[in-house]
């Protein structure tokens, strides 16, 4: 199954709490999963990435189930279709209240996800989620992923009781 992820998911994968990271690691470890990273989302991630972010990206790039998907000619055509539909419906921003530049980048991310056959787009961006849903693309958030057993079961490190005798 192919899953597209956006910039905020990438950021959470590197900087999130242990539960968030465990959920995403478990998703990626599943044998039938291919993660699609649209290049506009990757660029947004890299703007704020530090050395840890770059190291993480380098470690992921060599994996066959981690696909960086370009905004190429075919994606541009898909994106143009999305915008043309919005314009036909009377609002080039598709009803979004976001800045025009954000709407354009969101469309690029969505076009890439659709073009590469993503089953769903994982995002915490409400605007992108609404736009994707309106175009027939299912969206999910990280908390929709199951929590791995390895982080559910924790050992309590208790000190032995003091001997007060």
Would you name each region that the model predicts?
Residues 1-37, 46-63, 150-165:
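Short, well-structured N-terminal submotif of metal-dependent ribonuclease cores
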Residues 5, 37, 70, 104, ...:
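Short beta-strand scaffold positions
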Residues 9, 41, 75, 108-109, ...:
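Alpha-helix capping/helix-boundary segments
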Residues 36, 67-69, 140-143:
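General small-molecule cofactor/ligand-binding pocket signal
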Residues 52-56, 86-87, 139-141:
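Short, hinge-like loop/turn segments at secondary-structure boundaries
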Residues 67-100:
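Acidic catalytic patch
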Residues 100-108:
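Short basic/aromatic active-site micro-motif
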Residues 110-165:
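Acidic, PIN/NYN-like endoribonuclease modules and their adjacent C-terminal/linker elements
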């Amino acid at each position: 199954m192919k899953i597209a992820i956006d910039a905020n998911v990438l950021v959470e994968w590197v900087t999130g709490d242990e539960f968030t990271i465990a959920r995403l690691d478990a998703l990626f470890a599943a044998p039938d999963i291919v993660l699609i990273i649209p290049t506009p989302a990757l660029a947004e991630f890299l703007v704020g990435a530090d050395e840890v972010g770059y190291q993480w990206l380098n470690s992921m790039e060599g994996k066959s189930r981690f696909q960086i998907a370009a905004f190429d000619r075919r994606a541009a055509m898909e994106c143009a279709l999305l915008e043309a539909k919005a314009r036909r419906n009377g609002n080039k921003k598709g009803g979004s209240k976001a800045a025009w530049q954000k709407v354009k980048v969101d469309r690029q991310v969505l076009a890439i996800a659709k073009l590469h056959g993503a089953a769903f787009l994982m995002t915490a961006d409400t605007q992108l989620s609404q736009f994707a849903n309106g175009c027939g693309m299912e969206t999910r958030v990280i908390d929709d992923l199951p929590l791995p057993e390895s982080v559910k079961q924790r050992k309590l490190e208790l000190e032995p009781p003091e001997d007060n005798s």
